[in-house]
Swiss-Prot record:
The protein's name: Cysteine proteinase inhibitor 12
Organism: Oryza sativa subsp. japonica (Rice)
Domain (Cystatin) ranges: 49-137, 156-202
Function as written in the Swiss-Prot or TrEMBL entry: Specific inhibitor of cysteine proteinases. Probably involved in the regulation of endogenous processes and in defense against pests and pathogens.
Site (Reactive site): G49
Any GO BP: defense response
Length: 250
C-alpha cells in the first residue's frame, strides 16, 4: 500500500511539462497572428491612403514603357488604333506589387485625347496587367504650331477647358512653383487638385485662369492664378490670389 502511494506523485510530475508546452505554443501562435494582422492592417492603411505622386517618374523610360503597354493592351482588347503621345502625370500605389496610375495623351484618328490608365506590376513574377483605361476628354492643345491658328478660330473671352488637360496641368505646376518661390514658409506647396480651369487666346499668347487646391504642411488652401503661355511655350504667372472659403479656412 505504501509503495503504491509513493509512485503516484512521480507520474503526476512527469505529466506537468505538457500543459506548459501547450501554453507556450498557444502564446507563440497568438503573437504570430497579431504580427501578421498588424502588418495586414498597416498595408491596408497604406493602400487606403491612395496613390501618391511620382513626379520624377512622369518622364522616365520605365513610365513611358508602362504607358505604351497600356495603350497597346487597350488597342488589343477594343480593336482600337490609339497612338501613344506622352505621359502627362504618374502616380504610384503600393498593393501586392505596384499599381501605376497614369494620365497620358494618345492620338485617335489624328485627334489628341487624354486617357487615364492603371497598370498593375509585380516585378518578382514578371507580371504586368492593364486594370483600367478610360478617356477623360479631348486635349486642349495650345501648342506653338496651333496657337496662332486658334486666335481667329475661337470666340473672344474665357472658355472652360478640361482640368486634366496636359497644358492646364503644366500651367498649374508653374503657378505652384512661382507661389512657392514667393513664400517664406518652411513647408513646400503641393498641388492636390485643379478645381476649375478656363482659357483664352489673346494676340500672341494663351491665358489660363486656374483655381487650385494646394497643401502646405497639414493645411489645405485654395489659390486662383492667371498664367500666360507665349508662342515659345514659356509660362509666366501674371497674377495670383488666395481664395478664402469655409473649407480652406478650417
Amino acid at each position: 500500500m505504501r509503495v503504491a502511494a509513493t509512485t503516484r506523485p512521480a507520474s503526476s510530475s512527469a505529466a506537468a511539462p505538457l500543459p506548459l508546452f501547450l501554453l507556450l505554443a498557444v502564446a507563440a501562435a497568438a503573437a504570430a497572428l497579431f504580427l501578421v494582422g498588424s502588418a495586414s492592417l498597416a498595408m491596408a492603411g497604406h493602400v487606403l491612403g491612395g496613390a501618391h505622386d511620382a513626379p520624377s517618374a512622369a518622364n522616365s523610360v520605365e513610365t513611358d514603357a508602362l504607358a505604351r503597354f497600356a495603350v497597346d493592351e487597350h488597342n488589343k482588347r477594343e480593336n482600337a488604333l490609339l497612338e501613344f503621345v506622352r505621359v502627362v502625370e504618374a502616380k504610384e500605389q503600393v498593393v501586392a506589387g505596384t499599381l501605376h496610375h497614369l494620365t497620358l495623351e494618345a492620338l485617335e484618328a489624328g485627334r489628341k485625347k487624354v486617357y487615364e490608365a492603371k497598370v498593375w506590376v509585380k516585378p518578382w513574377l514578371d507580371f504586368k496587367e492593364l486594370q483600367e483605361f478610360r478617356n477623360t476628354g479631348d486635349a486642349t492643345t495650345f501648342t506653338n504650331a496651333d496657337l496662332g491658328a486658334k486666335k481667329g478660330g475661337h470666340e473672344p473671352g474665357w472658355r472652360d477647358v478640361p482640368v486634366h488637360d496636359p497644358v492646364v496641368k503644366d500651367a498649374a505646376d508653374h503657378a505652384v512653383k512661382s507661389i512657392q518661390q514667393r513664400s517664406n514658409s518652411l513647408f513646400p506647396y503641393e498641388l492636390l487638385e485643379i478645381v476649375r480651369a478656363k482659357a483664352e487666346v489673346v494676340e500672341d499668347f494663351a491665358k489660363f485662369d486656374i483655381l487650385m487646391k494646394l497643401k502646405r504642411g497639414n493645411k489645405e488652401e485654395k489659390f486662383k492664378a492667371e498664367v500666360h503661355k507665349n508662342l515659345e511655350g514659356a509660362f509666366v504667372l501674371n497674377q495670383m490670389q488666395q481664395e478664402h472659403d469655409e473649407s480652406s479656412s478650417q
